[in-house]
Structures are given as C-alpha cells and as structure tokens.
Amino acid sequence: MSESKENTIVLISCVKRKIDTTNGPVPAKNLYDSPLFKKSLQYAKEVLKVGEDRIFILSAKHYLLPLNQPILRYEQTLKNASAKERREWADIVWQQLSKRFSADTKYIILAGKNYLDNLIGSHRISNCQLPLDGMPMGKRLQALNKAIMNKTIL
C-alpha cells in the first residue's frame, strides 16, 4: 500500500461476542471480544499502519462507530434484518461516510456479506478493497493471522 494512509479508511464489522458493560460504557474498540474483530483491528493498525482515527466499526445498531466512542453492550445484528432494513442501515452509514470523508477516499472493508451488500457499488462506496470477501469465518481469521505474522497486506 504505497499511497497515503491519510486518504484511507478501514471499516470493520461489529461482532456478536461482546464484553459485559454493567459497570458502564466502554470504548467501542474494547466492546467487541471475538478473535476475528481483534485480529481485524490488529491488522488495520499493524499491517496497514492506519491510525485509530481512520478506523471505524460498522455497527448494526450504531451505524458508523469511531473506535473510541463509549457505548454499552447491545444485541443487534444485520444477519436477521430484512433486505429493506439492511438497505436503510446502508443508507445511514453512507450518509455518515459522505459527510465525513471526500469522494476520493479509499476504503478497506473487513466485513461480511450482510454489511457489504448495500454499502458498496457505483452509488455508494466504489473505491474499496475487500480483502476478506467471500471467505468463511475460519478462513478470514487464518488470513488475518498470516498477514499479521508476515506483515503482508491481503
């Protein structure tokens, strides 16, 4: 990745596994407790060398979520959402991205099908890389582990 990281945004999907927040909100980056989320974040920071201010979580509940945004545990997913609900979710996320970033922003998206389907395309995110696209969960984790270990970009 030779171009400037200043024009690159990494989007990581939220995950089901979360820590307990009965003692109060925690930064979003600390809420999600799955190996896939942790490795995705590690990959973005250590291999892609993107700063935390350029990494966001695609949250089924909170839409575009900065890593340090304090939040409470929640149970919401796009997995069981209707096609209409997923389109509405993508509309909101796209509006947030459009307001925040320029049209020439490059996105690296580490997310599954439910998060990608309505978010990428000619009228949405078109300048993107999907390094984990089409991989089952276990293969994603393997690919991230290997990339982190070898410091190679997927």
Question: Language-model segments: what does each one mean?
Answer:
Residues M1-L154:
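Peripheral peptide segments
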